[in-house]
């Protein structure tokens, strides 16, 4: 429940003078139990998500123990709420977080005009990366996706130039043919070793190609270390986003720089959440983003 748009009912005195009850806001992602310290190097740079003095538990280390936006009411640090412009809808506000994750990955990757970009995974983060890569001037975007039905959905978004089957036996050769000899940048949004290593092999043979890891692996990750060294690949990790990027996304929505509503697969009520998760599991990832309406 970290991707949210809400209406404040009560704003603690002296915390955020720009907000008042009834404003429409989007909530910058954070651990609701522990406010960023405000004095570490990350906080001083405005990167609260990477505060070195916070303890954040994830799916790998335990539960957050808080419903986040999976409830009618919740709490949020007031300084982490961004008031939405009048021409940004509530649904768009709820999409700010995943598109900030994509923006962060693209900025970490240092996408340049005319880059050929390979993205592994066609979920909301992969599509966010594709949208921002295009905005930053990428000339050719290829998305690799396992699910054949999802591949057709991705083609309908018209943001990727090529959508390929992640399980194709000749995938590496396909990628080299499509890109005319290799990509400038690999962005991994799935965390699957075989896919990542294939992506490494599909980078250009020239020096200093780039690879960015966004997806978290679910097990040990054997890396094609030899290929990494021989190609002198610049490998970066990308986690979350910072507050400036979050605000940039909202401003980009308001200006029309990016369009996000096409990625909303369907809408469900709060009481339908459990059934919604089961439907997502049964559909094996056909949804890109589901909006939960809490009222």
Region spans (language model):
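C-terminal hydrophobic helical "lid"/dimerization subdomain
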Residues: 169, 181, 193, 197-201, ...
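Single conserved hydrophobic/aromatic residue that forms the stacking wall/gate
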Residues: 1-5
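Glycine-rich beta-strand-centered segment in the early N-terminal region that forms part
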Residues: 6-44, 85-87
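Rossmann-fold dehydrogenase core element
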Residues: 210-212, 222-263
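Glycine-rich cofactor phosphate-binding loops and adjacent beta1-alpha1 units
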Residues: 109, 136, 142, 148-234
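Cysteine-cluster motifs in flexible loop/terminal segments that predominantly coordinate metals
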Residues: 29-79
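Mid-domain Rossmann-like dinucleotide-binding core that forms the NAD(H)/NADP(H) cofactor-binding site
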Residues: 79, 85-168
């Amino acid at each position: 429940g970290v991707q949210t748009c809400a209406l404040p009912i009560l704003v603690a005195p002296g915390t955020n003078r720009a907000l008042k009850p009834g404003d429409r806001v989007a909530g910058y992602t954070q651990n609701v139990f522990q406010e960023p310290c405000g004095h570490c190097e990350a906080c001083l740079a405005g990167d609260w998500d990477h505060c070195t003095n916070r303890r954040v538990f994830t799916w790998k280390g335990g539960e957050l123990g808080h419903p986040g936006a999976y409830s009618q009411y919740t709490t949020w640090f007031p300084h982490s709420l961004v008031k939405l412009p009048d021409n940004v809808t509530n649904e768009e506000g709820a999409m700010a977080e995943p598109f900030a994750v994509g923006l962060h990955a693209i900025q970490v990757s240092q996408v340049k005009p005319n880059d050929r970009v390979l993205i592994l995974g066609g979920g909301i983060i992969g599509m966010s990366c594709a949208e921002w890569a295009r905005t930053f001037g990428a000339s050719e975007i290829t998305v690799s996706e396992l699910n054949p039905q999802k591949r057709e959905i991705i083609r309908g978004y018209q943001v990727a130039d090529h959508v390929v089957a992640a399980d194709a036996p000749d995938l590496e050769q396909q990628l080299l043919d499509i890109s005319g000899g290799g990509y400038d940048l690999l962005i991994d949004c799935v965390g699957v070793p075989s896919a990542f290593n294939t992506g490494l092999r599909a980078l250009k043979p020239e020096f200093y190609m780039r690879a960015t890891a966004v997806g978290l692996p679910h097990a040990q990750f054997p890396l094609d270390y030899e290929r990494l060294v021989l190609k002198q690949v610049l490998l970066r990790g990308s986690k979350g986003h910072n507050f400036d990027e979050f605000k940039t996304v909202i401003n980009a929505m308001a200006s029309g720089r990016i369009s996000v509503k096409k990625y909303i697969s369907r809408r469900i009520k709060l009481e339908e959440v459990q059934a919604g998760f089961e439907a997502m599991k049964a559909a094996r990832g056909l949804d890109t983003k589901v909006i939960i309406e809490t009222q």
